[in-house]
């Protein structure tokens, strides 16, 4: 549980990332960041879909993207407060069209799946002895992926993705006593490896049923990721220090299994010449999470609802620069997987962003997000979170034969 009184120490993020596997990263695409995260049903020829592999099927040039994320958290527990900011690598993706006519596109990448980042001190006493307990954690899970999409029949886009999970979760607990130099501590390190699979589909034929013009489209999408079983190698490092002696010990490694539950998402989107509107719902069955066969009472099923839009004033490359920039706005509500002290931890946020053309097909996508999470009830933490996403992407033709003279 989150302690009654916490002092926020040094670098670190929210204490909520102490639970489960940390804060879950949800990144649909560079474009979706400014749209509340909505985009599971969006088909694009210049934005690489990370979650729904069916969204790759319209890419017709070799495309790449690399992303970074700044996250600043202002957190308080009703007594103490603090602000922490840090910049993270947020993934690299590449997509290569094999047969654009048939929607066959291969993609590969490495992206964050979860992140642990906290550093708090809790003062306490026992039998008239004052002491501080220092909780610190870092690490997280990374996902390497290999995906393929196809267009087997008109308007039905399908995709499949192989996911390889890897990472290390570190949690350290240290107790120090009064003004003395004595302390004892234990560091628990989990090294995780495992695989999973994702399948998805987008249906783009609704415009025909509704007799929309060729310039418009109305899509629905679905994506499903399987339950994954990760092998966990656990090590514990013990430290005890007095004024005259420092003792360190390492416990033998143990092999366990961690169960990452399945997820299911649905989305709809409408695209016209100038506007894109999208809405999604994404669910993950975290009640089924287990470590070494034991479930976590601090976790619950999660739901994320997102809605957003994009305005592109002009598609003509000869139009004024500011009219060739897409402008984005969105909202999301994340009923997160945290349930601390029997209190659900929910997050509500507003997002915005825009794309900056650089030259050719190279562009920068900026996404800005401000959200609120948690509560100070029961002296838990309330977080105000600012996130700034930066993505550099582009495309070019590969494997094209020159025309014969």
Question: Where are these predicted regions, by residue range?
Answer:
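Subset of outer-membrane beta-barrel
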Residues: 10-405
